[in-house]
Amino acid sequence: MSSMKWLSATAVFAAVLPSVSGFCFPESKELNFSRTGTSSSTTFTETIGENGTEYIVSGNSSFTNFTNIPVKKPTTDDSSTSTPTTSSAVDPTEKIVRASSSSSPNSGDTSATPDPKGGGAFYNEHSGILSFMARSGVEGSLTLSNIKMTGDGGAIYSQGELLFTDLTGLTIQGNLSQLSGGGIFGGSTISFSGINQATFSSNTAEVVPEETTPNPNPGTQTTTSQPSPTSKVQSLFTYSSSTQANGNGADSQTPSHKPGSGGAIYATGDLTISDSQEIVFSVNKASKDGGAIFAEKNVSFENITTLKVQNNGAEEKGGGIYASGDLSIQSSKQSLFNSNTSKQGGGALYIEGNVDFKDLEEIRIKYNKSGTFETKKVTLSLPEAQTNKSSVTAASQSGPNTTPTPTPPVTAKGGGLYTEKNLSISNITGIIEITNNKATDVGGGAYVKGTLTCKDSHRLQFQKNSSEKKGGGLYTEDTITLSNLTGKTLFQENTAKEEGGGLYIQGDDKTLTMTGLDSFCLIDNTSATHGGGAYVTKEISQTYTSDVEEFPGITPVHGETIISGNKATGGSGGGVCTKHLVLSNLQTISISENFASENGGGACTCPDNFPAPTASTPSTNQTAAPKDDKDFLIDYVVSTTIDKNKATKKGAGVYAKKAKLSRIDELNISDNAAQETGGGFCCTESLELDTIASLSVTKNLAGKEGGGLHAKTLNISNLKSGLSFSNNTANSSSTGVATTATTSQSPTVSSFLPRATAGSSPAPAQTTPTYAGVVGGAIYGETVSFSKCSGLCQFTENSAIDNTPSSPSLNVQGGAIYAKTSLSIEAEDPSTSYVFSKNSVSTGKAQTTGQIAGGAIYSPSVTLNCQTVFSGNSASMATTNPPSGTSPKDTIGGAIAGTTISLSKTSHFSENTADLGAAIGTLSGGSSSNLTEKITLSNGSFTFEKNKANKRGVIYAPSVSIKGNNITFNQNTSTHDGSAIYFTKDATIESLGSVLFTGNNVTAEQASSTATGGQTTNTTNYGAAIFGDPGTQTTDTTLKLIASSGNITFSNNSQNTATNNPATKFCSISGYVKLTLQAAQGKTISFFDSIRTSTKKTGQAQNSYETLDINKTENSNTYAGTVLFSSELHEVKSYVPQNVVLHNGTLVLKKNAELHVVSFEQKEGSKLIMEPGAVLSNQNIANGALAINGLTIDLSSLGAPQTGEVFSPPELRIVATTSNSGGGGGVGGYVTASKNLSAASPTVAATNPTMADNKVFLTGALTLIDPDGNFYQNPILGTDLTDVPLIKLPTTANQVDVSNLTLSGDLSPKKGYTGTWTLNPDPQTGKVVANWKFDMYRRWEYIPRDNHFYANSILGSQNSMIVVKQGLINNMLHNARFDDAAYNNFWVSGVGTFLSQQGTPLSEEFSYYSRGTSVAIDAKPRPDFILGAAFSKMVGRTKAIKKVHNYSHKGSEYSYQASVYGGKFLYFLLNKQHGWALPFLLQGVVSYGHIKHDTTTLYPSIHEKNKGDWEDLGWLVDLRVSMDVKEPSKRSSKRVALYGELEYSSIRQKSFTEIDYDPRRFDDCAYRNLSIPMGCYFEGAIMSYDILMYNKLSLAYMPSIYRNNPVCKYWVLSSNETSKVVCGVPTRTSARAEYSTQLYLGPFWTLYGNYTIDVGMYTLAQMTSCGARMIF
């Protein structure tokens, strides 16, 4: 390196300033004078070594105001030659040096332009290192300013490595190069380190185009040019710098790098800036690339406190930095790229390699622009040259052989950042902010051709960026991966003229993958086509994974997704547009307030209809998604909200193909609006909502179908806390454009949706799709199912409205749910309830010719296997009159409409409204001759209450099947008959519990119908709850009532126009109906209202009419129940034009009830019961017989007897047949009045009745019954009676046939007026009569009573006193406690006894038990004497059952006792001389008792009872003497003793009188007993842990030496009959065993207890007591 020659920086200035020309090549010399072009006073050291040159700066060193750019003066008009003017003052505005100047001058042409020369301050043309540093320990600053050169590096040029180290300040300002590197040009690496502050400002790299001077006389004029001083200097530089033989100096040939690039720095090698405080690049310009920095390799910033790259500009690429290699910013605090501009890409950064942001506090890329904008232009600061018009004209002219070069299309990608490869961001602790950048091409904020990876960082934000094409915030051509980001990852207020307002990913196989983000936000972004927030073709996914479970077994969730306020003004996907959106394991998801002018206001993910990007050809080889793959998936999220989104077409919230939302705690879909379908969701195939704790779908709106949810297949399952669909609306006109409703309750689509702007791209022309109508206010689907949901599931105030101003024709169906094919709701949890409330379908302005149906639900197939409530739902039509010639259809199904409808479990319908089927109605599914519509209610309880049908039927269908536990139709109303059920083919009602039709009302008196020929006829409304109408069919409808496990009842069903007045017409069933009645054994079908049926059959023959079978055996099921007609509530006259056959069971005609039939036949084994005034009659439409085989007359009600009658007898009536009768029955048939009865001649009995005859056939037993005993209380029976009428019969002889008639039943009453009946079998008066023989009057029915119970209760009283005595002997006395030192004691005991006595010849079986409490206190006046007193209370119960006579006794007892007890230890002296004595113990108890008894005796067979109250007084005396056989010793506590006892008890029962049934008076009686128990006992103590337990066991034989047999006399008050009852006393001998124990817990407390059992031959008594003793 010794041959190297170095040109010092001062050489440049020495050539210009002769005063310093002697110091051109200093070596290791301290220089202390000015080295600037103007003036400076600083210390500056230059050291030249073999490896390079080193400058040590002390203090402030500056090099300013120098240029080598020659200035050409313009020539005058009259001069033919031009002479340059030499000036020492350089004009920095001149631009006369061409970029294409020759590198070596032509010796023959003295006017040639000198070669470009740079490095005005420092110039190094060799490969050695050029370094600048501060003196150790001394601050040093370097300033290079206003140096403008024709060559590379305006201030510094170095072919070798360039180093800046440890400078306090470095200022490169206002410098210019007409090639590259306005401030610095480095031919190798450039490094800055340890700089406190470095400023690169207002530097420029500009390539000046070649200028041509015009020659006015080219043929004759010559130009003489003399070199200027500047030219001499350039020649000197060339010479001094070209001493090498090969001539490879930097200025000897055309440069290989990019001229016009690197406004501040141009580096052919790596550029590294590290370990510095503040680095600023500002207002630098480049006419090509890299407004501030251009690097042919890598650019690296490391450990920078503040980095600012701002207000720089490039005419082409990289307004701030252009790097052909990679860009790395690491370990720094603040990095700012602000207000930089470029015209062809990378407004701030244009990187051909990778970009790496790592370990930073914050990095901001703001207000940068890429492209040409009218608002601001790049201005270059260059030396100016005066140019005349002729020169411009000459420069613009080209030779004849010149071919214009076509201008390539200019792209301007990446308003803030452009990278040809990958962008990596990691460990940013503050913020990554890319805001307010613009690009006229793609990527307003950033353009990344490779992958973008951001991890372990805080706040990645793209805001207010804009693109004239795609990707307003971010545009990438490869996958984006975001992981472990904290704060908000934000894309906000970005705009794009094409797709992807927030971000855009190019390519069908690229994804946006996010893991572990705190918050991902797409907010207020806008695109002019698709994807307002984001456009990602393949997939967008966000999830959270964690290896740590805070709670075992529970996967943690974290993070949120917010997609809000985004707009796609000319396409789909206002929030996001992607083929797959997957969000899982998150805390919160919010998709809100987004807008799309086509589909998917919040998200568009439908792969089949996925919108292709602008100017792109859809791929023809895309891989089809798997059939089970979900293109929209939200899983395992705490809270999800999809609200306030809007779409001009479909799916305001989400537009997808297959969507699934699962395992969500709270899901809210609300306030979304779409002009066509799916306000909340629109899925072309399926939508699944699974395992959601709380689901709310509210206030969504669609113009046609599915205000809330729209899907081909919709499955909702496993909801844990129910769901809520409320205030969702489908509201539109027939053209598909929403109109404004006339009321505030009917919102329209247009009021919610913004209009597309004028600049929006027009939507492609499409054909109007075919819609089912305005359907599905909350839900639309082809197949809809709900399963395994729990809690309360609500559908409230959803609606479908057609607001067409006039002549609408759309169907309006399914206010809450519309299922095109089927709807299924299943619930396994019995507490689950589905509530449909105030849902509606309607026309808002005009009546429609379409079908309005299903206020809450519409589907051809409806299956509800759950508990449901339908309340306040309606299907209604506008009240305006329709245009002439139109025929609006009746509205159907206020709650449910469909073809086949099946309900099970429990359903409640209330206050629903429609024309037909106020609650449930069916729509035609076939021809009128083959009706397939059917309503089935089964296996549950069903209630229909206060529903209103504007025409007919709470239930309306051709076929109805009801089979349930409890079925109620209550207070429903209709205009015409059929207020509860209207059917046209068949109906079956089977009760498994109770079926009740009550209080239903018909408001109109007449029903108008159109007959054949167009004539209108009126028929009478009877107020029928059930109405059958076959229409034009020739056969009657069929109605079958089956009371299988419960009763069926019709009551108070009426026709009443004025509801304020009481009704006068009541009817249960009407219409053209063939009726069948079946009641199981013990069950009843009750008609408290009339039946008024008609028939399509005609003719006068009985066999021309249908048969009404009552209790006919069917399918091996035998029916033997009751069918009842009753006029208890109001008049009941039933007309049934059928032949009635009573097969089994019972037919009851209550008092004054009438049944008119064609004929009546009673089969053997059945029973016909008629009460007084009842009428069974045939009708006048045909001849028909009444064949009665055993008639029962219920005499409970007397009816209205006439003179000579004991009661009003029932009537068997025959009426004459009219010649013109036929088919009328109850609807129009005339019924003759009852004929007057007159004498009739005897008739011959007919054994086989002919049912076609107009005759009464009466045979078998005539049974009189009086179940309540009322009839025989009639005083008229107090005398003998003859010819008492029992039955009214026809008076015409040939109309009566009586044979083998017998009288039976309650003929001999047991109480009341008793007597006997005899039958007069000859009905000679048109009646069946009988004679009555009076016997006597009895008030009560007699039943024998043996009455032992009252006497036996004495034994219970005795036992209650013995149990107290046993407690005192065995506990309180306890061998008189002579070994006990305690003197005063308080005792509390619980006592109980049980006495059982078997039945004996003298007594009945009975039992007695009692329980109570005893307290006692005693003292020991002397050690050998004890005295105490006790008080006891017992509560007992006595029970006895006499099975033979069917009566039972139940008695209660209250016993109160007072006792005195004592004990004395004595010695009986046997031998005084020897001192022999026999010790013995004397114990005694005296008790007095007062016992109260309260007893009830029940007589179930006669439904009677007695009550008796009495008192007992008792005494008990007991004396026990015991003598030790073995006494305790010091070694043993055992004692063996013999004892004898004297026990006397006396119980006296006081007199008393019974009340209620046949009372008796009982006299006093007493029971006395003296017994002498004799036996032995054994005692012993056990000691453990200072606790003493003393036990005693005694056994005794107990003979009774005296007793009496209690005898009680009584009188029967009603008859003065006297008798006596003897008490069944126990046997004389019995045995007794006793066990007692005492547990000494310490000196003051003792626990004790005893158990006694007495066993006799017929008796067993058990007695026990236990308690505690306190010593004081």
Swiss-Prot record:
Sequence intervals crossing the membrane: none
Primary residence: secreted
Region Disordered, annotated ranges: 69-122, 203-263, 384-415, 734-765
GO molecular function, a single term: ubiquitin binding
GO cellular component entries: cell outer membrane; extracellular region
Low complexity bias spans: 77-88, 100-111, 203-234, 734-744
Polar residues biased stretches: 235-256, 384-399
Gene3D superfamilies: Autotransporter beta-domain
Gene Ontology terms describing biological process: double-strand break repair via homologous recombination
Record's subcellular location: Secreted, Cell wall; Cell outer membrane
Residue ranges of domain Autotransporter in the record: 1379-1672
Pfam families for the chain: Autotransporter (PF03797), Chlam_PMP (PF02415), ChlamPMP_M (PF07548)
Keywords from the UniProt entry: Cell outer membrane, Cell wall, Membrane, Secreted, Signal, Transmembrane, Transmembrane beta strand
UniProt key word Secreted: yes
Bilayer topology: Peripheral membrane protein
Signal sequence interval, chain numbering: 1-14
Sequence similarity: Belongs to the PMP outer membrane protein family.
Protein name per Swiss-Prot or TrEMBL: Probable outer membrane protein PmpB
Lineage: Bacteria, Pseudomonadati, Chlamydiota, Chlamydiia, Chlamydiales
